[in-house]
């Protein structure tokens, strides 16, 4: 699916969810949505969704830092016209276990602090697996 088609699909899906009351608004008319990414594939796949959800939700975008490097991720934010993440969790540890533990710990603390109405992750990465553990 092209990025243009993804963009249209994301907007139409959100409109339908609102129309059929799958989403009930609060917080001044907007649900608080925490979106957590950690890798390039997650950023690319979620770009259209992130941009469209900002219209309908109070979105907080967090980056785990799993693969953070301007050449690996930062350039995609610019090219996909995404705002920089509001939160960098800086979770990289000395090994895989430490990194995953840091993602669980820091994403849990972020969820406790922000109290989002929903959390969105997409993918099969260590970031997604660990965030699910924190939820």
Label every model-predicted segment.
Residues 1-2:
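Non-catalytic N-terminal targeting/anchoring module and adjacent flexible stem/linker
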Residues 7-66:
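N-terminal subdomain of nucleotide-sugar transferases
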Residues 34-37, 42-49, 76, 88-135:
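Active-site and donor-binding regions of nucleotide-sugar-utilizing enzymes
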Residues 58-99:
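Conserved nucleotide-sugar phosphate-binding/catalytic loop shared by glycosyltransferases and other
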């Amino acid at each position: 699916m092209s990025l243009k088609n993804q963009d249209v699909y994301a907007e139409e899906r959100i409109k339908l969810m609102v129309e059929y009351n799958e989403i009930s608004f609060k917080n001044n008319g907007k649900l608080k949505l925490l979106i957590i990414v950690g890798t390039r594939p997650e950023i690319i796949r979620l770009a259209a969704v992130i941009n469209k959800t900002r219209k309908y939700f109070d979105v907080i975008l967090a980056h785990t830092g799993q693969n953070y490097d301007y050449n690996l991720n930062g350039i995609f934010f610019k090219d996909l016209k995404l705002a920089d993440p509001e939160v960098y969790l800086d979770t990289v540890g000395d090994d895989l276990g430490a990194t995953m533990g840091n993602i669980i710990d820091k994403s849990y603390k972020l969820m406790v602090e922000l109290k989002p109405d929903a959390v969105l992750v997409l993918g099969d990465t260590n970031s997604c697996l660990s965030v699910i553990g924190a939820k």
